[in-house]
């Protein structure tokens, strides 16, 4: 490895979405969180860690991060979490990052990989599956 390709110890990324973008196409695998395979909350957790930010493992825990924002104010880097339907204890929800005002980046079983998708399409699919309306969380000022 060339020295120019190494970051100093303790150096962190500044944009979790840029970290997630480098993982586009990585296969989705429930419970995974690596560059070889990841699930939705694992992608969020990896991206936050790369930026020096604490990130819990599960979507319902991630829904408590940062400050609540309205959908109309959502922007790049905001976290979105669709919480699981009542009584469904097989998973805790689905998490994603806003890529911009209209698109998300997430690891999804529907597409089988980390993908960029229109927010409206993802939202319609998760709501049709019984998930709650998503919460939007601003992680950084």
Which residue ranges define each predicted feature?
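Short hydrophobic alpha-helical module
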Residues: 23-26, 46-54, 83
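Aromatic- and glycine-rich peptidoglycan recognition patches
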Residues: 4-8, 33, 93, 99-141
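Second-shell loop/turn segments in exported
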Residues: 27-34
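...with weaker cross-activation on analogous glycine-rich loops/strands in unrelated enzymes
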Residues: 53-114, 119
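Active-site nucleophilic cysteine motif
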Residues: 20, 34-51
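Boundary regions of SH3-family modules and the immediately adjacent low-complexity/disordered segments
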Residues: 1-22, 26
